[in-house]
Amino acid sequence: MKIKKGDLVQVITGKDKGKQGKVIAAFPREDRVLVEGVNRVKKHTKAGPTARGSQAGGIVTTEAPIHVSNVQLVVEKDGNKVVTRVGYRFDDEGNKVRVAKRTGEDI
């Protein structure tokens, strides 16, 4: 998967189109990423005992994972943020590195 934890991404489709956020977690097996402030959902939690005592029930707002095809990487070029696709290349030592397709720079 070309998007990693800690990357700054922009949503390109869906209800949150245009929003930017940092990737909190990546789930490569499901091809999904968790982006802060994007795809917020409300979960109804039941009150019940926990290890530390009682837990109050209620409605909790949290982020839900979105498919990696719905986000694009955002990189900085000349002080501007540019949305780009991600490619790979091998450097001089033979290590595989990510490359921003639009700028041609290593990520």
Swiss-Prot record:
<dbReference type="GO" id="GO:0022625">
    <property type="term" value="C:cytosolic large ribosomal subunit"/>
</dbReference>
<keyword id="KW-0694">RNA-binding</keyword>
<comment type="function">
    <text>One of two assembly initiator proteins, it binds directly to the 5'-end of the 23S rRNA, where it nucleates assembly of the 50S subunit.</text>
</comment>
<keyword id="KW-0699">rRNA-binding</keyword>
<dbReference type="InterPro" id="IPR005825">
    <property type="entry name" value="Ribosomal_uL24_CS"/>
</dbReference>
<keyword id="KW-0687">Ribonucleoprotein</keyword>
<dbReference type="InterPro" id="IPR005824">
    <property type="entry name" value="KOW"/>
</dbReference>
<comment type="subunit">
    <text>Part of the 50S ribosomal subunit.</text>
</comment>
<dbReference type="InterPro" id="IPR014722">
    <property type="entry name" value="Rib_uL2_dom2"/>
</dbReference>
<dbReference type="Pfam" id="PF17136">
    <property type="entry name" value="ribosomal_L24"/>
</dbReference>
<protein>
    <recommendedName>
        <fullName>Large ribosomal subunit protein uL24</fullName>
    </recommendedName>
</protein>
<comment type="similarity">
    <text>Belongs to the universal ribosomal protein uL24 family.</text>
</comment>
<dbReference type="InterPro" id="IPR003256">
    <property type="entry name" value="Ribosomal_uL24"/>
</dbReference>
<dbReference type="GO" id="GO:0006412">
    <property type="term" value="P:translation"/>
</dbReference>
<dbReference type="GO" id="GO:0019843">
    <property type="term" value="F:rRNA binding"/>
</dbReference>
<dbReference type="GO" id="GO:0003735">
    <property type="term" value="F:structural constituent of ribosome"/>
</dbReference>
<dbReference type="InterPro" id="IPR008991">
    <property type="entry name" value="Translation_prot_SH3-like_sf"/>
</dbReference>
<dbReference type="InterPro" id="IPR041988">
    <property type="entry name" value="Ribosomal_uL24_KOW"/>
</dbReference>
<dbReference type="Pfam" id="PF00467">
    <property type="entry name" value="KOW"/>
</dbReference>
<comment type="function">
    <text>One of the proteins that surrounds the polypeptide exit tunnel on the outside of the subunit.</text>
</comment>
<keyword id="KW-0689">Ribosomal protein</keyword>
